[in-house]
A protein has these predicted regions:
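Single-stranded nucleic acid-binding surfaces, predominantly the OB-fold ssDNA-binding core
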Residues: 1-203
Length: 203
């Protein structure tokens, strides 16, 4: 596995034209959703953020196929119901393509919370890991990751602070959040990891 720190490649369908999000250091940023089909036929709908100058390099149109190269980013949003971790793909390049669907991500970082190991109702072994991935300018992206089977068993025994590399795909998953005012449908974004490499355990 190549240790790139934080890299993702997506190839999918643009659901709608990008919408303005915010400006930072005189750069305008836009947000859009890319639909990436899985081999099973279902699709992950993933949020992407890109600077205006990056988008101008591609002839964007709804329903078109585009290749996105970038990083998985996160930030905490404060709301009345508490802090929420917001996940998106920060696009470094966006290009028109005819390639088949692609969703490949590699992350290198440190486990920052005790891994949570459990079995699904169907008996599948899974392990939830929160990975702290360092970024430039002393920033950190916190990326939820889920591991399966034998890799889940391996991750379950790792301590906080262990340095690991993961490879997999970024997936979207719907769930229901129960709030005092009622139930609310939400979407979670997480790395579904197929490969795990332990770099340093830091016991």
């Amino acid at each position: 596995m190549e240790h790139t720190g934080n890299h993702i490649t997506l190839c999918g369908t643009l659901r709608a034209l990008p919408e303005y999000s915010h400006s930072n250091h005189e750069r305008r940023f836009f947000r859009f959703e890319l639909e990436v089909e899985r081999l099973s036929g279902t699709a992950d709908v993933l949020p992407v953020m890109a600077a205006e100058d990056v988008l101008m390099a591609a002839d964007l149109f709804a329903g078109g196929r585009f290749l996105v190269e970038g990083q998985i980013r996160s930030f905490y949003s404060r709301a009345e119901s508490g802090r929420r971790l917001i996940i998106s793909v920060f696009a470094e390049t966006v290009t028109t393509t005819e390639q088949p669907p692609q969703n490949d991500a590699v992350l290198t970082g440190a486990i920052c919370k005790p891994p949570i190991y459990r079995r699904t109702p169907l008996g599948r072994e899974i392990c939830d890991v929160m990975l702290a991935v360092p970024r430039q300018y002393q920033r950190t992206d916190y990326i939820p990751c889920i591991l399966w089977g034998r890799t889940a068993q391996c991750a379950a025994g790792l301590p906080v602070g262990a340095q690991i590399a993961l490879a997999g795909r970024l997936q979207s998953r719907g769930y229901v959040k129960v709030l005092p005012e009622g139930a609310e449908e939400r979407t979670a974004y997480e790395l579904s990891a197929m490969e795990l490499e332990i770099l340093e355990e830091n016991f």
